[in-house]
Amino acid sequence: MANKSGRITQVIGAVVDVQFDSHLPEILNALETTNQGNRLVLEVAQHLGENTVRTIAMDSTEGLVRGQAVEDTGGPIMVPVGEATLGRIMNVIGEAVDELGPVVGEAKRAIHQQAPSYSEQSTEAEMLVTGIKVVDLLAPYSKGGKIGLFGGAGVGKTVLIMELINNIAKAHGGYSVFAGVGERTREGNDLYHEMIESKVNVDPHENNGSSAGSKCALVYGQMNEPPGARARVALTGLTVAEHFRDQGQDVLFFVDNIFRFTQAGSEVSALLGRIPSAVGYQPTLATDMGALQERITTTTKGSITSVQAIYVPADDLTDPAPAASFAHLDATTVLSRSIAEKGIYPAVDPLDSTSRILSPLVIGEEHYNVARQVQQTLQRYKALQDIIAILGMDELSEEDKLTVARARKIERFLSQPFHVAEVFTGSPGKLVDLADTIKGFKGLVEGKYDHLPEQAFYMVGTIEEAIEKGKKLAAEAA
């Protein structure tokens, strides 16, 4: 080990220079030292010559001194993987931060991996049924696809993410990994407790300190962490997800927020002395994003489906950060404040959300035709809203009145009670089968349910429930 040790020569914020006597660690190797009694990991980013390497610190560098000894571990950052990570919270270097003792995984795996080769990748376009009507019908997710979740504050992003984890866990028996990149610590804490309350994860305090039986692993690098940790925590989460995929699982991988992954990369880039590119971002923006996104893919063994929350700076979609992630997305789920204001949850915008697999070749003729008819009806209603606002409903033709009535029913039928929101709403959550979703909306656009009041369609699961609710409303009115 003697020849593998070096010493710190310079500390500038999150960037630390280390000089070695003879041995020089490779780029991306993890170096270890101690700082105020804690293990500090440094990742090699550049070779400067004269046996000196420039590294990025994965934790605070306050307290480091020049001349301090540093050891080369001989490989990249290694994190525990496997079922031991489920129900636990880890940081970027795989240390537990939930005060339940260390995470002892089946194995350790390097956070930097090659993307699967062409021969390993699966080329089938297969739909991943989520049990959420609006998503399954109008912007279906594909197994192994990448979904961008666009939404402001308070429109239900976290609840939608929670419900997806819950539904996939129930319907597919699959595992989920949540990477909080530049997360608010409070939100991360809320998510952990919400998962226990909604039975996605097991409460260790009621299970002899064990989280066995949980369905979701959490990897956090919060806002207060140095940029090194925020730039790598998405890779740590992905490494945990890749292990489950290689075991033959269908994994759901959440990143909140992909913009902060880019932002952290930009902070580090400036400290490393790279010349910034457009809008001050790192020159390696597309490479960094590609290295992460190309690993999120379906292989012949299993699939990773990723849902990524994307913050758009100043609502400018042409900003280099969101633009770099757009190139990789297969589907976009847009959450709209105007829909949330109507009390329709999930507040997914049915006209703005898109999907690559909304094609008759993948989802079949019937599903495709019903989805297009639903969108046409909603689009027509949107076009008529100005006329209604100025002249009122009475000025519309009979045909347009019928379109408006159907569109309002469709709007309400796109709402659905969530399992994870049961504690707040008091109404039991619904998981709707794809065939039931198509059948319900097909009947709506064909006019089979024109006789039912629009309230009957609000916050129900299948069309049968809407008919039942309609009968109840009629009985109450009588």
Curated annotation (Swiss-Prot):
Q: Does the keyword Nucleotide-binding apply?
A: yes
Please list the residues that bind ATP. Answer: 151-158
Q: Which residues form a coiled coil?
A: none
Q: Does the keyword Translocase apply?
A: yes
UniProt cross-references to Pfam families, sorted A to Z: ATP-synt_ab, ATP-synt_ab_N, ATP-synt_VA_C
NCBIfam families associated with the record: atpD (TIGR01039)
Reaction(s) catalysed by this chain's protein: ATP + H2O + 4 H(+)(in) = ADP + phosphate + 5 H(+)(out)
Keyword vocabulary terms for this entry? ATP synthesis, ATP-binding, Cell inner membrane, Cell membrane, CF(1), Hydrogen ion transport, Ion transport, Membrane, Nucleotide-binding, Translocase, Transport
Under the subunit heading, UniProt states: F-type ATPases have 2 components, CF(1) - the catalytic core - and CF(0) - the membrane proton channel. CF(1) has five subunits: alpha(3), beta(3), gamma(1), delta(1), epsilon(1). CF(0) has three main subunits: a(1), b(2) and c(9-12). The alpha and beta chains form an alternating ring which encloses part of the gamma chain. CF(1) is attached to CF(0) by a central stalk formed by the gamma and epsilon chains, while a peripheral stalk is formed by the delta and b chains.
EC number(s) recorded for this UniProt protein: 7.1.2.2
Please give the function described in this protein's UniProt entry.
Produces ATP from ADP in the presence of a proton gradient across the membrane. The catalytic sites are hosted primarily by the beta subunits.
Main location class: membrane
The record, for CDD domains, names: ATP-synt_F1_beta_C, ATP-synt_F1_beta_N, F1-ATPase_beta_CD
What is the protein's species of origin?
A: Azorhizobium caulinodans (strain ATCC 43989 / DSM 5975 / JCM 20966 / LMG 6465 / NBRC 14845 / NCIMB 13405 / ORS 571)
Q: Per the record, what is one GO cellular component?
A: plasma membrane
The name this protein carries in UniProt is ATP synthase subunit beta
The UniProt entry's sequence similarity note says: Belongs to the ATPase alpha/beta chains family.
- How does this chain sit within the bilayer? Peripheral membrane protein
| Superkingdom of the source species | Bacteria
Subcellular localization is given as: Cell inner membrane
